[in-house]
């Protein structure tokens, strides 16, 4: 009988933020996101100049955990989630650890989208979901081998999940998704009337000294 194995696995981590640490007041967090967006004129200007629909603090604010204690609570929980994911991935960090590199807010209104991209200077990337209205878009992940499939036929409709070229993860508010930063991903257009609110972040490798 033939022996078939799945090789070079791509892992996707999903859990409730509260699995590591106390629950976060989601109403307070959502209000904080809107308050920050309203006051962040530099971020608003960046979004307008770069054609980003809605709002992101990615290019304007680097100290959210210092400004708002609720973000510090989120980071404490994320540290534990990332540590659990690193254990699953069996990384050898050579005495070092993964440290939060940056964290930012995303508010996507109806019709907003975030095109395909990756995070080349980080090890682990992820998103914590604050508001996911009914019908909003999923996170779309792409098989990292896609560029090498020049002559490969397409997969049959209904192919097994692990064989599909794209995977759509539909998290709920309060969920954390983690993946390795080289994995290309996007947020398709938000068809929901309400805003899709999330907090994204990167972790980098802090080598032992």
Task: Go through each PLM region and give its residues.
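Non-heme Fe(II)/2-oxoglutarate
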Residues: 1-92
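A generic structural micro-feature
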Residues: 7, 95-97, 118-122, 191-195
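Hydrophobic residues positioned within well-ordered beta-strands of beta-sheet architectures
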Residues: 13, 101-103, 124-126, 197-201
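Solvent-exposed residues in well-ordered beta-strands and their adjoining turns
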Residues: 18, 108, 129-131, 202-206
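Short helix-to-loop capping/linker segments positioned immediately adjacent to catalytic or ligand/cofactor-binding
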Residues: 65-69, 89-93, 112-116, 127-128, ...
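Hydrophobic beta-strand-centered segment that forms part of the acyl-chain substrate-binding groove
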Residues: 89-110
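Catalytic core of non-heme Fe(II) oxygenases with the double-stranded beta-helix
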Residues: 105-176
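Catalytic core of Fe(II)/2-oxoglutarate
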Residues: 158-209
């Amino acid at each position: 009988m033939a022996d078939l194995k799945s090789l070079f696995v791509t892992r996707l981590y999903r859990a409730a933020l509260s699995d590591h640490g106390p629950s976060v007041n989601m109403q307070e967090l959502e209000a904080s996101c809107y308050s920050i967006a309203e006051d962040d004129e530099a971020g608003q200007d960046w979004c307008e100049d770069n054609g980003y629909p809605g709002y992101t603090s990615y290019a304007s604010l680097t100290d959210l955990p210092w400004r708002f204690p609720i973000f510090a609570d989120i980071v404490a929980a994320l540290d534990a989630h990332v540590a659990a994911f690193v254990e699953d991935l069996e990384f050898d960090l050579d005495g070092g650890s993964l440290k939060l590199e940056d964290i930012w807010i995303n508010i996507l209104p109806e019709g907003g989208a975030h095109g395909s991209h990756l995070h080349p200077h980080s090890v682990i990337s992820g998103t914590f979901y604050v508001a996911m209205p009914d019908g909003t878009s999923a996170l779309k992940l792409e098989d990292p081998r896609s560029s090498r499939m020049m002559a490969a036929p397409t997969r049959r409709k209904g192919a097994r999940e692990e064989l599909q070229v794209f995977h759509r993860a539909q998290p709920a508010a309060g969920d954390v998704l983690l993946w390795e930063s080289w994995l290309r991903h996007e947020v398709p257009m938000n068809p929901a009337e309400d805003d899709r609110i999330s907090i994204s972040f990167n972790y980098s490798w802090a080598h032992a000294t």
